[in-house]
């Protein structure tokens, strides 16, 4: 197969030299009822969904303001001499002296200040450093021929001194107690300086004067490893910058690509099998989404193993909700690249299917529908039986959101076209669950959705529908016959036991009255006719009453808000937006 149009072939490793930038994109909206024509699959997004900066959601009601807490910080090695002298402005200095002045400012910005134990100390010198960083950001953005060979080691050193540090222990609980949607992130106290350092380095990488052949002496494997360690920072603003910087490095340094992928794999393995706690999984998956989008065809065995051994096991971690949109995007990208991977992916999802975690089950159903939107009919026929056995269990779930999400599959025209082509194998699997729950499910909304699904099946193949109804009736009769045989057998055993002389000594207390299910009778011919009439009327009513795009939300508790944290996250401007705005201004 030839490479896809997006694959340039510049990279010996099979990826583009420049993959699609992880530009901010709106989150995927719920699947609308009206789909493209049934012969067409839904096109996927070209960029991965961006990671949310703030995952804390409030369900309304009065706000409870929590007292602001001092934000803990990373462990910096503070400089002993922190007295900075204000240097002349770069734009006002003679051209021949600017390179030396630029280097002086870079070295001056290697001085580290205390923002935690004594935030009011050295205010004058902190302002000198902040102003110097701001000036260098503007200088490298709007000037040309300023990134000379002498600047590379100084810029990388300044970045390393300011950013590479020991991260503090997590302030939030780990394991089952950790709730990423409610536990507030710990913001970096030194952010006024760190933000400008990140902005400068990003502009440095994006500069037209930047030459990877020179920079590779300084941006090496050791640098990348230290950069990846920072992805565990609790501050989402920092992870947002790191994501963009690592993606730019991946695009510009071809020799580091395999190493970056390998180290990301190691982070994932440690997360899955050891710690189950890492703050940057969503951002790393967002980067990988763009990388996978640029893979050349046919896919290498290394990339297929990454899908099976890393991406699929990521589904079993407790904190899946934090990174699931990015993970689902990566999986779908692989299937669009190579449809033969569909069977192992769906089998893997069914293997990791949640047993007792209903919100997680809804996430799996969302992802499964995205996969079915891009599946080839030949691949669908390989997996439809185990797939619909699982869907039948979901339809029977007492958790109404799980049942509801599964039944929404019948509003997807492409999925319905696949079912129609394989109705003889799908309907016998689904009919018992649909019929049983049309009578017994506690939620009336589910009744309407079930009647809609039954109506579609009935219109699809009336004879097959009648056959399934008769088969279900026969199975119920067989079940009643087996139950009667079992009762008779126990009665015989009890009669034999009564013949024993010691029977009165060991006689059991009278049995409890039998427990009847909500559906004990075998469906009669009248029941079947009533079912058909009910399906027609209820399905029409359901289409009127139920919204086609219903967002499934997990209801959160009312927690005190940290006003400082909320304001800081709202004020943060994403790195890509910052770059786009500056480039348009040029």
From Swiss-Prot:
Entry GO CC: cytosol; nucleus; protein phosphatase type 2A complex
GO BP annotations, alphabetical order: signal transduction
Transmembrane annotation, as ranges: none
Pfam families linked: B56 (PF01603)
Sequence repeats: 21-22, 23-24, 25-26, 27-28, 29-30, 31-32, 33-34, 35-36
InterPro entries the UniProt entry points to: ARM-like, ARM-type_fold, PP2A_B56
Pro residues bias locations: 23-35
Cellular localization per UniProt: Nucleus
Residue list for modification Phosphothreonine: 47
Tissue: Highly expressed in brain.
Short sequence motif Nuclear localization signal: positions: 532-549
Ranges where the record places region Disordered: 1-80
Compositionally biased residues, Low complexity: 36-45
Similarity remark: Belongs to the phosphatase 2A regulatory subunit B56 family.
PANTHER family noted in UniProt: SERINE/THREONINE PROTEIN PHOSPHATASE 2A PP2A REGULATORY SUBUNIT B, SERINE_THREONINE-PROTEIN PHOSPHATASE 2A 56 KDA REGULATORY SUBUNIT DELTA ISOFORM
Function: The B regulatory subunit might modulate substrate selectivity and catalytic activity, and might also direct the localization of the catalytic enzyme to a particular subcellular compartment.
Known partners and oligomeric status: PP2A consists of a common heterodimeric core enzyme, composed of a 36 kDa catalytic subunit (subunit C) and a 65 kDa constant regulatory subunit (PR65 or subunit A), that associates with a variety of regulatory subunits. Proteins that associate with the core dimer include three families of regulatory subunits B (the R2/B/PR55/B55, R3/B''/PR72/PR130/PR59 and R5/B'/B56 families), the 48 kDa variable regulatory subunit, viral proteins, and cell signaling molecules. Interacts with the PP2A A subunit PPP2R1A. Interacts with SGO1. Interacts with ADCY8.
Protein name as annotated: Serine/threonine-protein phosphatase 2A 56 kDa regulatory subunit delta isoform
